[in-house]
Amino acid sequence: MSQLFLILCFILTHFFAIATSLNDQGLALLSFKQSIQNQSDSVFTNWNSSDSNPCSWQGVTCNYDMRVVSIRLPNKRLSGSLDPSIGSLLSLRHINLRDNDFQGKLPVELFGLKGLQSLVLSGNSFSGFVPEEIGSLKSLMTLDLSENSFNGSISLSLIPCKKLKTLVLSKNSFSGDLPTGLGSNLVHLRTLNLSFNRLTGTIPEDVGSLENLKGTLDLSHNFFSGMIPTSLGNLPELLYVDLSYNNLSGPIPKFNVLLNAGPNAFQGNPFLCGLPIKISCSTRNTQVVPSQLYTRRANHHSRLCIILTATGGTVAGIIFLASLFIYYLRKASARANKDQNNRTCHINEKLKKTTKPEFLCFKTGNSESETLDENKNQQVFMPMDPEIEFDLDQLLKASAFLLGKSRIGLVYKVVLENGLMLAVRRLEDKGWLRLKEFLADVEAMAKIKHPNVLNLKACCWSPEEKLLIYDYIPNGDLGSAIQGRPGSVSCKQLTWTVRLKILRGIAKGLTYIHEFSPKRYVHGHINTSNILLGPNLEPKVSGFGLGRIVDTSSDIRSDQISPMETSSPILSRESYYQAPEAASKMTKPSQKWDVYSFGLVILEMVTGKSPVSSEMDLVMWVESASERNKPAWYVLDPVLARDRDLEDSMVQVIKIGLACVQKNPDKRPHMRSVLESFEKLVTSI
């Protein structure tokens, strides 16, 4: 009898230990899991109730106190309701459940998470009103509820969320007036998308107070009526304002931010008139001369031949105004005929087939310097690839789509009439760089030809603007793919084998720049946003050479390169990837800077965490896990769960990454050694 009692006590004690081994954070997550109807084994394979905490579970991130700070389960085909237990995770900072099939109303408990910074629920089937309690999320910076079935009005309860930078409510059933007060209070907004709803009334004047907007202000596909408020003229000129498919009426205000948007931004409003839709208003003369549209300078000699400056479209293609180009071309030709006795044309032989003679004519002067300085109305189109398949005329007639922008200019996707797709980077340097210097720099860039470096195809020069033309790379950048951003390669495609080959390709490109380029260059700003992915996910290192051309801020050295960014955060993205010693302006640029940055790219590839958005220092976090002998899966990207049999390879890559991010640059390996390590790893799997 006593033996039976002891056995019973042992069983009860063991059961109690199992039942209580998981902390309150894990229990809340298990309640969340239970509310999901189709629990995929691949998603919740390591959500184990016997764990002491949930910090190693797929999609879960914890801080140093083992409190859950983020839940990221995008595109996992999950369905069910959002369990109120999620509101008990009081340290939660980020929730990303986009592209699933969650349904029902948002639980009020969700809005008790006072520290929540990002809430991304796009692409689900949520419905009902957004609770008034959303105003309690005063730390919220990103709110994306797009592509759901929410209804009701957009409430002033959002006003307390003054830190909001991204507000995306598109493709729902929100109705009623857009309240006055949002624009004047949410002044930090960088993205505002309210398209495809049922919003009515006039556009509030205080929308013009959103002077920090970047990219697109999208109010399209609603039922807004009345006139376009003149306050929109306060918005940044590079912003694309989409007001299409509403019931707006009257003349379009003559502000550059609206004129630059192009006609597609106003289509579907039958009672609008004026430029850029070219429907005259009966009450006023709305004709705008080209100088008002394309330049602020009164002197016609300084106008640019490149009409790319006028293209601001991000969603719909904007046709380049070839007729205006011809107008300027004829004027240039007339001036050439008038002054032919005192002009000399210097035409590069390899340009004769693709360049109009007028673009390479300079007045005869006493010196080369005088020639270049005094003739600021000249333009040059220069192919850098002998097999180039387009000329300047074709480029000017092409459709252009704005892909992104940074502090050094804009990047467009250009589609030629024959279907050829190009990427055109438009640089602005305020005229400081003369033709001779520009051509010398781009010729140096063009000599860097490697399968893993984005190669320059052609360039165009004018005194105040420069164009660099590249092949268009279709699969976006590596950072977007890792983070699973919309429009990028699905993170599911980034298996461990694919990631390893991408890292090897980047190492090949950097090794070529370091070891085999004419001057053994330093790239200077390697990060995942300027690693582009080709059709077969082969990496292309982009942005090389830009710092030599653009007169950027003083923190960019003459031989450093600014990356192709798609956004312009307050703290520039590349600063998160910089080597510690690069912060000193007294330090000479070194190839070991690139090694450090590449080390961070490696860690981002392995962990799935970005140095920019992570709650903690990525290097310190991985180093700490290594020092505490944490299992590999503690730091690995949850998406890599299916490749668990390759864990040894992943551990080796983590070691390479940690070697590259040594604080002492002398202890970092050379890129050649890093490449050799990756070659061995790829061969071994």
From Swiss-Prot:
Domain notes: The protein kinase domain is predicted to be catalytically inactive.
UniProt topological domain (Cytoplasmic) ranges: 327-685
Keyword DNA damage attributed: no
Keyword Oxidoreductase: no
Residues in LRR repeats: 65-89, 90-113, 115-136, 137-161, 162-185, 186-210, 212-234, 235-260
Topological domains annotated Extracellular: 22-305
Taxonomic classification: Eukaryota, Viridiplantae, Streptophyta, Embryophyta, Tracheophyta
Gene3D superfamilies registered for this protein in UniProt: Phosphorylase Kinase, domain 1, Ribonuclease Inhibitor, Transferase(Phosphotransferase) domain 1
Family of this protein: Belongs to the protein kinase superfamily. Ser/Thr protein kinase family.
Chain segments annotated as transmembrane: 306-326
Protein name: Probable inactive leucine-rich repeat receptor-like protein kinase At1g66830
Principal location class: membrane
Recorded topology in the membrane: Single-pass type I membrane protein
Residues the record lists as Phosphoserine modifications: S399, S480, S590
Glycosylation sites (chain numbering): N38, N48, N151, N193, N247
Gene Ontology CC annotation, any one: plasma membrane
Keywords: Cell membrane, Glycoprotein, Leucine-rich repeat, Membrane, Phosphoprotein, Receptor, Repeat, Signal, Transmembrane, Transmembrane helix
InterPro entries per UniProt: Kinase-like_dom_sf (IPR011009), Leu-rich_rpt (IPR001611), LRR_dom_sf (IPR032675), LRR_N_plant-typ (IPR013210), PRK1-6/SRF4-like (IPR046959), Prot_kinase_dom (IPR000719), Ser-Thr/Tyr_kinase_cat_dom (IPR001245)
GO terms of molecular function: ATP binding; protein kinase activity
Chain ranges of the Protein kinase domain: 397-682
